[in-house]
Amino acid sequence: MSFRIGHGYDVHKFTSAKQNIIIGGVEIAYHLGLEAHSDGDVLIHALCDAILGALGLGDIGKHFLDTDNQFKNIDSKFFLAEIKKMLDKKQYSISNIDCTIIAQAPKMLPHIEKMRACLANILEIQISQINIKATTTERLGFIGREEGIATHVVCLLYR
């Protein structure tokens, strides 16, 4: 059996030009949005990078350029579905995924189960294979000042 580990990280700053945020494919009511070329889903972006990294295929920016207008305001679930096809083509399967959302606000706990279900559905895996947790920075740094949100994701693949 062959194993591969990937790590992904993403961060987006808040903008008053949008309302509500999308994280893990779930829309969360909030007075600000996340600045991005796509929908700004920091969790899906980090997850894409983790899978691509484990496959040795670079990062999300290599496959979906942020200068390409076809990806302007696109639902990030599209990226994850395309990366799932790459995963299948390389004949790897997901063992597990572990995600950490770092945000002072809004609170993530009420939305985590919906995120897990959404991601499991796209990746065609069991919800039990995805863990999502959230933390704050205890009001330190740009996240603590509520200027943005970051995520880290680790995935383990096997074949």
Curated annotation (Swiss-Prot):
Requisite cofactors: a divalent metal cation
Family, as annotated: Belongs to the IspF family.
Enzyme class: lyase
Textual note on the cofactor: Binds 1 divalent metal cation per subunit.
Site (Transition state stabilizer): H37, T136
EC number, as in UniProt: 4.6.1.12
CDD domains: MECDP_synthase (cd00554)
Pathway stated in the Swiss-Prot or TrEMBL entry: Isoprenoid biosynthesis; isopentenyl diphosphate biosynthesis via DXP pathway; isopentenyl diphosphate from 1-deoxy-D-xylulose 5-phosphate: step 4/6
UniProtKB keywords: Isoprene biosynthesis, Lyase, Metal-binding
Catalytic activity as recorded in UniProt: 4-CDP-2-C-methyl-D-erythritol 2-phosphate = 2-C-methyl-D-erythritol 2,4-cyclic diphosphate + CMP
Protein name: 2-C-methyl-D-erythritol 2,4-cyclodiphosphate synthase
Database matches in PROSITE patterns: ISPF
Molecular function in Gene Ontology: 2-C-methyl-D-erythritol 2,4-cyclodiphosphate synthase activity; metal ion binding
GO biological process, one term: terpenoid biosynthetic process
Residues involved in 4-CDP-2-C-methyl-D-erythritol 2-phosphate binding: 10-12, 37-38, 59-61, 64-68, 103-109, 135-138, 142, 145
InterPro entries named in the record: MECDP_synthase, MECDP_synthase_CS, MECDP_synthase_sf
Described purpose of this protein according to its UniProt entry: Involved in the biosynthesis of isopentenyl diphosphate (IPP) and dimethylallyl diphosphate (DMAPP), two major building blocks of isoprenoid compounds. Catalyzes the conversion of 4-diphosphocytidyl-2-C-methyl-D-erythritol 2-phosphate (CDP-ME2P) to 2-C-methyl-D-erythritol 2,4-cyclodiphosphate (ME-CPP) with a corresponding release of cytidine 5-monophosphate (CMP).
